[in-house]
Amino acid sequence: MSNPLPRKLFVTTALPYANGAFHIGHIMEYIQADIWVRFQRMQGNQVDFVGADDAHGAPIMIAAEKAGLTPQQFVSNIAAGRKQYLDGFHIAFDNWSSTDSPENHQLAQQIYLDLKKAGLIASKTVEQFFDPEKNMFLPDRYIKGECPKCHTKDQYGDNCEVCAAVYSPTDLINPYSALTGATPVLKHSEHFFFTLSDPRCVAFLEEWVSGLDTDGKTHLQAEVANKVKEWFSARTNPDGTISEGLNDWDISRDAPYFGIEIPDAPGKYFYVWLDAPVGYLASLKNLLDKRGENFDAYMAEPALEQIHFIGKDIVNFHTLFWPAMLKFSGRKTPNKVFVHGFLTVNNGEKMSKSRGTGLDPLKYLSLGMNPEWLRYYLANKLSARNEDIDFNPEDFIARVNSDLIGKYVNIASRAAGFIAKKFDGRVVSDWATADDVFISKLRNVASEIQALYDQREYGKALRTIMEQADAINAYVDANKPWELAKKPENSAALQEVCSRLLEAFRILTIYLKPVLPELAKQVEALLNIAPLQWSDVGTPLPHNHQVNPYSHLMTRVEPKMLDALFDMPAVVDVTVNVPNGTSETEVAADSTIEAIAPEIKIDDFAKIDLRIAKIVNCEHVEGSDKLLRLTLDMGEGRLRNVFSGIKSAYQPEDLIGKLTVMVANLAPRKMKFGISEGMVLAASAADEKSNPGIYILNPWPGAEPGMRVG
């Protein structure tokens, strides 16, 4: 049932920006791609599945500076945290790289030179805001000021968060630098542009968007193609604004900038979105170099299919700039760009950290929740369209428990026990004839399920599989093996019924394996067989084959797990109440000051190891409106993860690079959001209503990470 000629596939997912941990949107996309890759491999197809960190840009450069790190060190620290997510959710990339890799530098510069040779690079003088104190041009998000529409203060340089107006940074009233507070000045600079408006680019893109791939199907989903076509020509939008068609694309940024230098242009760097998609090719080249294979020869193979999985928020980069860059630099263009929607929660509410509607991937794992529950649930929701999908806790519980436990695992639990206890683990297959209706019906849907997986119609595939599970359970109810087991004269019938059930369970496992790879491994061990391939659907367990004793395959989802997953801590964590009074008299006279704790001996205090720590990274905690996740360097050769209830008082970017005081020898604590490896000290008032502030302790200049406080 495999393809006559194996396919050769180069598969990627969108690159995550290397300024923070993975969120659930990343995990959803990786699961979608991983299922497709695993399915293709079960068909006997060759797949190279690669990813990378998007490592360049002003935000990373600035965050690294605040943390007292080089951008490379900052990105490396972020990258070190990727493995726990990927391994945790059984996402099996063949290679993970970085856009700051040597391969990406070389490829990005060569693509630029090829585009320049093709006459598609032009230079223009642009006017930008410049921070005279920082001595750098400011990206839009690092310029703030008063909104020109609603006059709300402290709005970003490209849009207002209050009235949603979109404008140019030069439209801001009283603009200032978000980095230094200085008033920016307008300066001219020469920038380089990829001339996407060139008739050659327009003609190619119109053909690529509407044209057919080698499989006779379009490169894009129909709804995506229709949207992209709207960008090709000037038009008046429903809101009265004018769209000008394809514009030339500014691909350069001025120093200082963390990125890839533009050849023969000192002080100029590629805009991050030019070298980011090149990172797909660079990660593949890095993988091929490790294997001793030639990258150019690999990419030149006519049968190679280049497949990109992305979210709908980055369609323009992947369906306009990226194909045109590849085409006119003389490279292979994408065969498919598969676009998915966003993940919402509770019937369409967007994921929100502040409202407690976020789904934090690490918290999910730290609660001991089975990653394959989530893989199965998301797969049930995913289709070939770029529609948003909804995570509903009640639906999650019902679907996992009903389908995976009640329908699928239940088959093995009913049959394997009898085979082990009464027949020494031996199955029979003399019943397995070509005209066996029960098993034949199960095998006959293989091609239908195969097509649905290939088309990324996972929800339809799983519904078809569960229809087969229903039929198998109906067979159980009709034949009642528990009744057959009561009479010795029914021994042969019992063995045949249970053998049929295990064969049916084996076939269902093949169908589910792309979604549930770890559960499939357990089933392969139970059935004492080699790793299952799609072509094994028609090959039953041999007659007298011995299976292993049944052991529990999967537990049920408990509602309390979902309560914990979306629960927000009710109290501020890891803060210390410190009196605000300045003298003993004032403390005694002020009833709002918290009473001093009972007296302790010096030996008690000596047990507490207080150390100076540097905050090298800080980020919001998905699902919590009180916690920040701090990454701390205490000078011990490793970084620590600490949760602190200071979100109401601080923005993460304001803490990066600061020194603080932490309890270094506090036992690690398993929290709902992960492991906290210490406690940072902060002050807060006993009466939070009159003084709601939280004040993190910050040592005087001269203190260094690792110094003891006492």
Curated annotation (Swiss-Prot):
GO cellular component, one term: cytosol
Intracellular or extracellular location(s): Cytoplasm
Coiled coil: none
Stored Gene3D superfamilies: HUPs, Isoleucyl-tRNA Synthetase, Domain 1, Methionyl-tRNA synthetase, Zn-domain, Nucleic acid-binding proteins
Recorded catalytic activity of this chain's protein: tRNA(Met) + L-methionine + ATP = L-methionyl-tRNA(Met) + AMP + diphosphate
Domain tRNA-binding per the UniProt entry, residue ranges: 604-710
Positions that bind Zn(2+): C147, C150, C160, C163
Matching InterPro entries: aa-tRNA-synth_I_CS, Anticodon_Met, M/V/L/I-tRNA-synth_anticd-bd, Met-tRNA-synth_bsu_C, Met-tRNA_ligase_1, Met-tRNA_synth, Methionyl/Leucyl_tRNA_Synth, MetRS_core
GO molecular function, one term: metal ion binding
Chain sites annotated for binding ATP: K353
GO process terms (BP): methionyl-tRNA aminoacylation
EC numbers for this chain: 6.1.1.10
Cofactor binding description: Binds 1 zinc ion per subunit.
Essential cofactor(s): Zn(2+)
Any Pfam family: Anticodon_1
Domain of life according to the entry: Bacteria
Claim: Isomerase is one of the keywords in the record: no
Keyword annotations: Aminoacyl-tRNA synthetase, ATP-binding, Cytoplasm, Ligase, Metal-binding, Nucleotide-binding, Protein biosynthesis, RNA-binding, tRNA-binding, Zinc
Family: Belongs to the class-I aminoacyl-tRNA synthetase family. MetG type 1 subfamily.
Subunit relationships: Homodimer.
Chain's role: Is required not only for elongation of protein synthesis but also for the initiation of all mRNA translation through initiator tRNA(fMet) aminoacylation.
Protein name per Swiss-Prot or TrEMBL: Methionine--tRNA ligase
Organism, scientific name: Herminiimonas arsenicoxydans
